[in-house]
Amino acid sequence: MAPLWEVLSSLVTPEPNTRTHPHIWYWKDTKNHVLDSGSIITAEQAERRVLILENPNMRGESKITDTLYAGLQLILPGEIAPSHRHTQSALRFVMHGNGAYTAVDGEKTIMRPGDFIITPSWTWHDHGNDSNEPMIWLDGLDIPMVNHFSASFAEKLN
């Protein structure tokens, strides 16, 4: 047991208490880093070739806020990111390239810049690029929130 009166002021604060700081990642600065990652590691080696956007005040924690993860994913022509599913929900905002796809529970969607695709929790999904140009999209997942509830797990197909 512990006395509430000794910790109450740190449990319930008069103002929000967050380590999240505002930050901007400029496309002109990030695009080439993402494209360069294609020569550093293959999609097969990485499973998902992603550069994580970490909040500068949360280095090493793989999160952009207390509850959200974000990363920039690259799939080169001819590559496939194999099917898997996980308890986290995901969103994808396509930023560069035309013609790659995301398939959610077998339903294939061709991706173009500006498209917004959601992947509900625990749905099988994979990505592939049948086009002749690299594809980049922003991945957003609720990984930190799901981790907070100790509910994070995943399954690979086969």
Predicted region positions:
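A short glycine-rich, His/Asp/Glu-containing loop-to-beta-strand
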Residues: 39-77
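Short, structured patches in soluble enzyme cores that scaffold and shape functional sites
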Residues: 74, 95, 123, 129-131, ...
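Double-stranded beta-helix
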Residues: 130-158
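Activation on folded, globular domain regions of eukaryotic proteins
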Residues: 23-27, 65, 71, 138
